[in-house]
Amino acid sequence: MATILQHLPTGQKVGIAFSGGLDTSAALHWMKLKGALPYAYTAHLGQPDEPDYDEIPRKAMQYGAEKARLIDCRAQLVAEGLAALQAGAFHISTAGVTYFNTTPIGRAVTGTMLVAAMKEDDVHIWGDGSTFKGNDIERFYRYGLLTNPALKIYKPWLDQTFIDELGGRAEMSAFMTQAGFGYKMSAEKAYSTDSNLLGATHEAKDLEHLSSGIRIVNPIMGVAFWRDEVEVKREEVTVRFEEGRPVALNGIEFADPVALLLEANRIGGRHGLGMSDQIENRIIEAKSRGIYEAPGLALLHIAYERLVTGIHNEDTIEQYRDNGRKLGRLLYQGRWFDPQAIMLRETAQRWVARAVTGEVALELRRGNDYSILDTRSPNLTYQPERLSMEKVEDAPFSPADRIGQLTMRNLDIVDTRAKLGIYAKSGLLSLGSGAALARLQNDDPS
């Protein structure tokens, strides 16, 4: 039996990741009418744009689900989000502004926890709303099969019969209305939004055009800081970490990481912190564009990175950043639980995060405009007296020590000059006019 089913398996249990939106509502009711036994599973991810989570399973039952369950994924989502933070698992950035991989983290949690819930109900066929052009179809495929090796995949959006009958949103709305549910399409936005409590993604439609930008977006986790009429006041904030874990905001300790992140979202959101506009490579290598929000993670990231740079040495920081970019790509590709990702993540959590204890004070202004006001940690290797321009007692090194250190540099300076001479003789370098520095020649042998 094929892993991916191209036609509806009638008479069998079919699990569907049910959001309560038009697409999954129409798909669920259509599967019921065609003879399948739909089971609906909804992930509670703390979506900031979802007003009533408990209503979603009730809708699924009305539309024909044999069973509908709401799976609380918030604790696991925050745990994975903080693991990504500790490892710096973020590979997409533009001019120093970071995308925090909030959607890939959400898919890792959703893909595993929903399929695990389906196994409890003896459901081994799974469908979701991802399209064939996106990243999620591969992420869910990988996480689903990792969780249940017997899993089969059925997606209505890959079934030509479903496409022929309900190929667009207008057809789906008419189908639901005709079935007596009175379903009305929500007003079409100029873009689509996907969110969880870690962050929000705005993409597609008008945002596919690079001539459109952040100004058409209505933030759901913060304020439109680019609008002059939006008042944003300066705010001082403190963030405290213990062994790599954020534990306090503004002096208030949080035993529950979910509660801490929600408060971080509120603080960062008041300023529009963590919004970014990114062009990225999808898994299939085609480029896409998204506008992202992640106010809480952005706040924690600033404080965490400040402590990392004050505590660890240069080589450790280099490995942390290099491995973080590699891990970010693996996370983006749906490989968060692959052995190579676990190796990189565990290394950072053990040898980088464990030493990160301390408190950072910041002043937040508009958007990503902030200043660091203070950094305190018992583990700081930053010690100003080591490099003070004033006289200090028991100085760690003397002028004579530095003379000796510089003299040792003569060895590699001599070697470097010799190499430059070799390159000059071979025609790769020439002396610049009026200067003793070598210049690169044209590498064209002709």
From Swiss-Prot:
One of its GO terms (cellular component) is cytoplasm. It holds the Pfam family Arginosuc_synth. CDD domains: ASS. It is found in: Cytoplasm. SUPFAM superfamilies: Adenine nucleotide alpha hydrolases-like, Argininosuccinate synthetase, C-terminal domain. It is an enzyme of class 6 (ligase). PANTHER family: ARGININOSUCCINATE SYNTHASE (PTHR11587:SF2). Pathway: Amino-acid biosynthesis; L-arginine biosynthesis; L-arginine from L-ornithine and carbamoyl phosphate: step 2/3. It comes from the Bacteria. Homotetramer. Signal peptide: none annotated. Its EC number is 6.3.4.5. L-aspartate binds at T131, N135, D136. It catalyses: L-citrulline + L-aspartate + ATP = 2-(N(omega)-L-arginino)succinate + AMP + diphosphate + H(+). L-citrulline binds at Y99, N135, R139, S192, T201, E203, E280. Keywords: Amino-acid biosynthesis, Arginine biosynthesis, ATP-binding, Cytoplasm, Ligase, Nucleotide-binding. GO terms for molecular function: argininosuccinate synthase activity; ATP binding; protein homodimerization activity. HAMAP family: Arg_succ_synth_type2. Its main location: cytoplasm. Transmembrane segments: none annotated. ATP binds at A17, F18, S19, G20, G21, L22, D23, T24, S25, A43, G129, T131, D136, D194. It comes from Methylibium petroleiphilum (strain ATCC BAA-1232 / LMG 22953 / PM1). Belongs to the argininosuccinate synthase family. Type 2 subfamily. One of its GO terms (biological process) is urea cycle. This is Argininosuccinate synthase.
